[in-house]
Curated annotation (Swiss-Prot):
Main EC class the enzyme belongs to: hydrolase
EC number: 3.1.3.16, 3.1.3.48
Protein name per its UniProtKB record: Dual specificity phosphatase 29
GO terms classed as biological process: glucose homeostasis; muscle cell differentiation; negative regulation of ERK1 and ERK2 cascade; negative regulation of MAPK cascade; protein dephosphorylation
Function: Dual specificity phosphatase able to dephosphorylate phosphotyrosine, phosphoserine and phosphothreonine residues within the same substrate, with a preference for phosphotyrosine as a substrate. Involved in the modulation of intracellular signaling cascades. In skeletal muscle regulates systemic glucose homeostasis by activating, AMPK, an energy sensor protein kinase. Affects MAP kinase signaling though modulation of the MAPK1/2 cascade in skeletal muscle promoting muscle cell differentiation, development and atrophy.
Matches recorded under PROSITE patterns: TYR_PHOSPHATASE_1 (PS00383), TYR_PHOSPHATASE_2 (PS50056), TYR_PHOSPHATASE_DUAL (PS50054)
Gene3D superfamilies: Protein tyrosine phosphatase superfamily
Length: 220
């Protein structure tokens, strides 16, 4: 396959990737979004920002960072962080926990996950997303989501949050995060995010159909 053919196939794969929003429904746009494959998704990450520092803001008041950021209590306090989600919680990973921040005004949530393609991180998608959402519901809050490198586990949980609570497709979420930080979940996590994407897209389409049927019923 030539490079030109790759570009064309990728363009076709996600050129129609759109958020399934009521506005689009009203405007009559065709909902033809299809979850891209792992290779196409990885290309989206590669096209993102080369920026990779200890911590980056990827959504208002939502930051992805590394172990060094999480361990630096002074800088966390100075920067005004109020919540920490550790996606590498545990003795053999980033061993912090609530006690580590006990004398600080920080709420902690730990996810004991390994950065392995075989690890099922999806069971933590909704609890982690709920923690992030509660944090961001307060205008004065600021949350750090971290793992060891701030590239795979933490990025996966942030992507899941944007998909679940901000009604983004996986493509939307990747583009939002990748433009602000160089991240790349492992293939296993990408597969789990693809499954979440398919489920959420189906739910939104069902909801839109039901809303449309109810609207038609009121007009009769």
């Amino acid at each position: 396959m030539t490079s030109g053919e790759v570009k064309t196939s990728l363009k076709n794969a996600y050129s129609s990737a759109k958020r399934l929003s009521p506005k689009m429904e009203e405007e009559g746009e065709e909902e033809d979004y299809c979850t891209p494959g792992a290779f196409e998704l990885e290309r989206l990450f590669w096209k993102g920002s080369p920026q990779y520092t200890h911590v980056n803001e990827v959504w208002p008041k939502l930051y992805i960072g590394d172990e060094a950021t999480a361990l630096d209590r002074y800088r966390l306090q100075k920067a005004g962080f109020t919540h920490v989600l550790n996606a590498a919680h545990g003795r053999w990973n980033v061993d912090t926990g609530p006690d580590y921040y006990r004398d600080m005004d920080i709420q902690y949530h730990g996810v004991e996950a390994d950065d392995l393609p075989t690890f099922d991180l999806s069971v933590f998608f909704y609890p982690a997303a709920a923690f992030i959402d509660r944090a961001l519901s307060d205008d004065h809050s600021k949350i750090l989501v971290h793992c060891v490198m701030g590239r795979s586990r933490s990025a996966t949980l942030v992507l899941a949050y944007l998909m679940i609570h901000k009604d983004m497709t996986l493509v939307d979420a990747i583009q939002q995060v990748a433009k602000n930080r160089c991240v790349l979940p492992n293939r296993g996590f990408l597969k789990q995010l693809r499954e979440l994407d398919k489920q959420l897209v189906q739910q939104r389409r069902r909801s839109q159909r039901q809303d449309g049927e109810e609207e038609d019923g009121r007009e009769l």
